[in-house]
């Protein structure tokens, strides 16, 4: 599949998506969003892919939406623009396969919202993260008001959105915005190491973990616990469960097939 604004690479069970507009700091335009949509659909439908990694080329992960067109948007067009971007972020969050945002530099506005749609975020020490939309007289429109608040809490999320300030990688880790921060030189190695570790696990259980956690966040506790129990029963019908238990008893590494 050919793309203009992104690059994709299949590496064993891993699928790498690299935003490829480095001269624009990988800003999100309509073409990039459409190609990102197609790329994640491709990865989701490939049974060999176990983990999806999203990163950016050059010094930015993604500097947000391409604002050059903003003054020409009518209110109706702006609503559609926001809706389209948010739907793609929703799609990434709902993928059955684990996703990792490898934040190599600036993750601002829609770029941070893209990272927030991923399950795990690993950032370089040099990374700068923020939602600066307030400085344009607007506010986040790709899910940031909701996802950031759920990740770091209301107070810190409001401060980030109301000031538009960027925070460095070390503070992002302290806030829980990213899972870990590593030197830029080690970023790809550490991301690949984590992705390969996850890729060895049962795809069915990984998908159910995502489903139960994501749905449980917006449900009463008892509903989330009930969903957890139902999913736990489901995995007992799988070949992966049999393989995992057998491997443990036989003191060997399991080989999960996603069945």
Curated annotation (Swiss-Prot):
Active site location: 113 (nucleophile), 133 (proton acceptor)
GO biological process assignments: fatty acid beta-oxidation
Entry's pH dependence statement: Optimum pH is 8.1 at room temperature. Retains half maximum activity at pH 6.5 and pH 9.5 at room temperature.
Similarity comment: family membership: Belongs to the enoyl-CoA hydratase/isomerase family.
Keyword Coiled coil among record annotations: no
UniProt entry keywords in alphabetical sequence: Fatty acid metabolism, Lipid metabolism, Lyase
InterPro entries for this protein: ClpP/crotonase-like_dom_sf, Enoyl-CoA_hyd/isom_CS, Enoyl-CoA_hydra/iso, Enoyl-CoA_hydra_C
Protein name: 3-hydroxypropionyl-coenzyme A dehydratase
Top-level taxon of origin: Archaea
Keyword set includes Plastid: no
Role noted for this protein: Plays a role in autotrophic carbon fixation via the 3-hydroxypropionate/4-hydroxybutyrate cycle. Catalyzes the reversible dehydration of 3-hydroxypropionyl-CoA to form acryloyl-CoA, and the reversible dehydration of (S)-3-hydroxybutyryl-CoA to form crotonyl-CoA. Inactive towards (R)-3-hydroxybutyryl-CoA.
Gene3D superfamilies in the cross-refs: 2-enoyl-CoA Hydratase, Chain A, domain 1, Lyase 2-enoyl-coa Hydratase, Chain A, domain 2
Assembly: Monomer.
Signal sequence residues: none
PANTHER family recorded: ENOYL-COA HYDRATASE, MITOCHONDRIAL, ENOYL-COA HYDRATASE-RELATED
Pfam family, one: ECH_1
Annotated transmembrane regions: none
Example GO molecular function: 3-hydroxypropionyl-CoA dehydratase activity
Catalytic function, reaction form: 3-hydroxypropanoyl-CoA = acryloyl-CoA + H2O
């Amino acid at each position: 599949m050919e793309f203009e604004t992104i690059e994709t690479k299949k590496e064993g069970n891993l699928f790498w998506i690299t935003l490829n507009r480095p001269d624009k700091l990988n800003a999100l335009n309509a073409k990039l969003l459409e190609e990102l949509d197609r790329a994640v659909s491709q990865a989701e439908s490939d049974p060999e892919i176990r983990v999806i990694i999203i990163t950016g080329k050059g010094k930015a992960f993604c500097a947000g939406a391409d604002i050059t067109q903003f003054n020409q948007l009518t209110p109706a067009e702006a609503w559609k623009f926001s809706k389209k971007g948010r739907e793609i972020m929703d799609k990434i969050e709902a993928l059955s396969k684990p996703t990792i945002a490898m934040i190599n530099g600036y993750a601002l506005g829609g770029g941070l919202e893209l990272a927030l749609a991923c399950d795990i975020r690993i950032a370089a020490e040099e990374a700068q993260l923020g939602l600066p939309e307030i400085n344009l007289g607007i506010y986040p429109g790709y899910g940031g008001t909701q996802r950031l608040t759920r990740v770091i809490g209301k107070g810190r999320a409001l401060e980030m959105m109301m000031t538009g300030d960027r925070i460095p990688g070390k503070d992002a880790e302290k806030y829980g915005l990213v899972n870990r921060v590593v030197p830029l030189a080690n970023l790809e190695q550490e991301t690949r190491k984590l992705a390969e570790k996850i890729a060895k696990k049962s795809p069915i259980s990984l998908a159910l973990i995502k489903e139960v956690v994501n749905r449980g966040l917006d449900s009463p506790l008892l509903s989330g616990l009930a969903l957890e129990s139902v999913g736990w029963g489901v995995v007992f019908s799988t070949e992966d469960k049999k393989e995992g238990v057998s491997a443990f008893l036989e003191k060997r590494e399991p080989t999960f097939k996603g069945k």
